[in-house]
Regions:
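Outer-membrane beta-barrel proteins
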Residues: 39-43, 109-111, 141-145, 185-190, ...
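Membrane-spanning beta-strands of outer-membrane beta-barrel proteins
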Residues: 77, 114, 160, 204-206, ...
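Extracellular loop and loop/strand-boundary signature of outer-membrane beta-barrel proteins
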Residues: 67-70, 105, 148-153, 188-197, ...
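Surface-exposed loop/turn segments flanking beta-strands in extracellular/periplasmic regions
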Residues: 47-61, 289-295
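Predominantly the C-terminal beta-signal and adjacent terminal strand-loop region
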Residues: 362-379
Length: 379
């Protein structure tokens, strides 16, 4: 499957304005963005087709013709963005700040709606920071691909913003991060589809701990561990009777990343051993490993996926971008006893994608084109 995108991003910072009130500073920002895209095949692409992930499998009709072989495309501007950064008064020895950022990527049945991207408050000390609110998931992190596509490297690069409580501590060139996160817009899969009920009923947030090392020579390296614990069901219908059940699916994921920033070029890479990270736009999910014959209570096992990507950029005014990503389905730790599975792309054995892009950049403006061939091998 091939995808072509023309990015007409008038990254015109529509509000690069600063306003002041006693002990407060407000900096407004934003941009108008347009995405024109053409796909040679039907694909998995949320956000009304604007967030490309991977091509769908063949779907033959009565004559054996592939129903997913047709092209599609459109033009959207709903990822245009508005935001405000607020610097507040000192609270003791801490500097206070806040951010609110929105776009128009929320959807009802027929229209786009204003959507919160980030909304948080933060307290900064000399070596530490506490952040409370919604911002980028720590697996998105400080290392992500520099490409034009809205998906920003997904399904190889985690893409997610969640409500969270985050603590960071910096010692010289090392920054430590610990986060507790809850789901809102990006949701895990389960018996009732994508829903926040699985983590809500779990009463256990997602947890992440990680470390980054940044050198004066331009290198950034780091890694982290992520835990998710879901309750897929609280009741079971078994032999025409309803039973209360105590089910839980817990999974660990691991990631490592590196980035080098030179004067006119960058190199970045990330690799994950991912389990149950479908809510971060990665391929993943879980299946059923056992069923209690008395009440239908189930145990679960996560699918494990190895996913990696690399990214190069060169230039500033005229900029070249290259990206390559690969995901491999490693199966489950325990044998599945049911064909029922919950997640995204679990019928895919492996996916490989490349992305070649060029952009022309001026102050407050960017225009670019990219070509992205992607191949998915289905089981």
């Amino acid at each position: 499957m091939k995808k072509l995108i023309l990015l007409l991003a008038g990254i015109c910072m529509v509000f690069p304005a600063t306003a002041q009130k006693k002990n407060f500073t407000y900096k407004f920002y934003g941009f108008v963005r347009g995405d024109l895209f053409y796909n040679t095949r039907v694909n998995m692409a949320p956000v009304d087709g604007n967030f490309y992930l991977y091509p769908l499998d063949k779907r033959p009709d009565a004559d054996g013709k592939d129903l997913n072989a047709g092209p599609n495309g459109s033009f959207y501007t709903f990822t245009s963005r508005l935001g405000v950064d607020v610097t507040g008064p000192d609270i003791g020895t801490a500097r206070s700040s806040a951010k609110i950022e929105v776009d128009f990527g929320g959807f009802s049945s027929s229209t786009t709606m204003l959507r919160i991207r980030q909304a948080y408050v933060a307290l900064d000390w000399e070596k530490s920071q506490i952040l409370i609110g919604q911002t980028w998931h720590p697996l998105f992190g400080s290392v992500c691909p520099d490409i034009l596509n809205l998906s920003t490297g997904a399904p190889f690069q985690p893409f997610n913003r969640e409500p969270q409580m985050r603590y960071q501590y910096k010692v010289e060139d090392v920054k430590l991060t610990a986060s507790a996160l809850w789901q809102l817009q990006y949701l895990s899969s389960g018996p009732n589809g994508m829903s926040e009920e699985y983590i809500k009923n779990s009463c256990v947030p997602e947890f992440y701990v990680g470390a980054d090392y940044a050198s004066a020579s331009g290198w950034l390296t780091g890694g982290g561990v992520h835990l998710i614990s879901l309750k897929p069901r609280t009741s079971s219908v078994w032999n025409e009777k309803t039973y209360k059940v105590n089910e839980r699916m817990t999974a660990l994921s691991y990631e490592a990343h590196v980035k080098y920033t030179g004067r006119h070029f960058t190199f970045a890479a990330k690799s994950l051993l991912a389990s149950c990270l479908d809510h971060t736009a990665l391929i993943g999910g879980y299946g059923i490993s056992s069923i209690d014959p008395d009440n239908g209570e189930q145990e679960y096992t996560p699918f494990r996926h190895s996913t990696s990507w690399i990214n190069f950029t060169c230039g500033t005014k005229w900029k070249g971008h290259f990206f390559a990503g690969y995901t491999k389905n490693l199966g489950t730790a325990d044998v599945l006893v049911s064909a029922t599975e919950y997640g995204m792309g679990l019928d895919i054995d492996q996916v490989f994608s490349t992305n070649i892009a060029f952009s022309y950049n001026l102050p407050h403006w960017q225009i670019g084109m990219e070509y992205m061939p992607t191949t998915a091998w289905y089981v």
